Amino acid sequence: IQFVKGEEYQRMAYNNQTQKRQINPKRGTIYDRNGKGLAISASVDTIGVNPKELRDEVKGDETKLRTIANDLAAILDMNSEDIMKKFQANSRFEFIKKKVDREIGSKVRAYVADAGLWSIYVDEDSKRYYPKGNLASHVLGFTGTDDQGLNGIELVLESTLKGVPGKIMNEVDV
């Protein structure tokens, strides 16, 4: 087997043992002529989970899953049933909540570390805001929920402002 399809089996084994997650880049800042930011990306966090891995971590114990969901719901100001649905998904990654304040992200990080959970992730993300409000909004344009430029300078300079995505690779148990 190793000689006939060795490279193929090696690739399959590697894909089964690693999980790749994309890291979204921080969108570039648009400045006025005096160097003041007109469109800025603030650092926020996005919370995600590998449902299959989480169920393995708690050995399928529904009570533990519900406790984790309740604890996260309290931190994230969410409905615990919505979180449970994400825990029960048949996938390797689900978003729990996107673009939460860094303070909330820190609380989730602390909870996850204390509970010894490696399948719940807190990734750095960014959120676009305009410090001058509607000033020059017809020229600046705006971004969508995925931080993609949809109008104005945000759209015209999309390729420059969007940055280059990165990735995190984790080793997972099979």
Spans of model-derived segments:
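Periplasmic/cell-envelope proteins involved in peptidoglycan metabolism and beta-lactam response
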Residues: 1-174
